[in-house]
Amino acid sequence: MTPALHLEILDLRHFSASYLKPVLEAESRVWDQRLRWDFHASASLLLQYLDSRLLPGYVAIENGRICGYVFCVYESEKALVGDVFAVPSVTNPQSAADVERRLLEHMIELLQHSPGVDRIESQLLLRPHGTHTETLRNAGFQIYERLFMELDLNSASLAGGPEGGSTDGLELRTWRDNDFSAAGHLIAQAYEGHLDGIINDQYRSVAGSLRFLHNIVRFPGCGLFDPSASRVLAYRGREEIAALLLCSRVREDVGHVTQICVSRKYRRRGLGAWLLADCSRALRLSGFQALTLTVTRENTDAVALYHRSGFVTRQTFDAMVWERRGGVRV
């Protein structure tokens, strides 16, 4: 911690939305500059929760001014650290990371000493990989490096289609509201034994996958869901799904892939590239400039697919997971 930095760390629930609004406005600018992401819808939703005074978390106060915050949400025996952010200082850029570290330490201490919490997850997109490694490792977290990747839709070739093997029984179409159940089953099956099921335990069951889908489609945390750009490879005449790509609008001219997965039966046939290309073509026709996605670096097959499709890494960040020893594991 910078010696001149004197902070108070106080309960977030003591403050109404108006006190946090300047910090969220500063954060919105960082999201746009760094990730081309319009954060205003997420900020508006967060402000509503702040006014309810029910959101667990902390604020950092320096010289009487709120300069950062952290919050979490609970899901059964799991806590999700939804965000941590401190306003960057022009004179001391490192101070923001120091403030965030203090906030994370308080949040983690609270959660690890909460008897009902057996698991903590978070993905800190705004902070480059390694920013808070020491704090997280000291607290017993596993850290997984993830990539935030971007495709320039103006220069991409957008070529892609099935390779080898018959796909005659499949129909490529846009997302429908009645796809929820089939999509939940596909996600749980596709991620069985997968690294990303360690990072996000919702992928480990159909019920968890349906909660994930509900959050993606109904809430603006990962942008505004765009069914016209989302793609489904469905079995003709059946309700099952062989592959899917879900896309949200994170800025008026930027789409974001919130989920892409392929049934084990149809892997290595070019279906992932096909979904990406078809989604990208639809976005470009609608005037979009870019498509983004996130992927775990250790997921080498997926990283290679995205590179072949023209994606480049815009930023790296950390996903973090902590589980209580002897706690309930799914």
Per-segment meaning from a language model:
Residues L35, H40-L111, L245-V254:
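Conserved donor-binding loop and adjoining core beta-sheet/short helix segment
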Residues P3-L24, E171-D201:
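A short beta-loop-alpha structural element at the N-terminal edge
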Residues E145-E171, Q289, T294-T300, S309-G310, ...:
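C-terminal "cap" of GNAT-fold acetyltransferases
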Residues L126-E145, A273, R297-Q315:
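Conserved active-site alpha-helix within GNAT-family acetyltransferase domains
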Residues P93-E109, V262, R268-L285, A304-R308:
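Conserved acetyl-CoA-binding loop-helix of GNAT-fold acetyltransferases
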Residues Q33-G57, D201-G237:
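Active-site rim helix/loop that mediates acceptor-substrate recognition in acyltransferases
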Residues I120-T131, R264, L293-V303, M320-G326:
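Conserved beta-strand-loop-alpha-helix junction that forms the acyl-donor binding cleft
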Residues M1-P3, E77-K78, S89-L170, R176, ...:
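Acyl-donor-binding surface of acyltransferase catalytic domains
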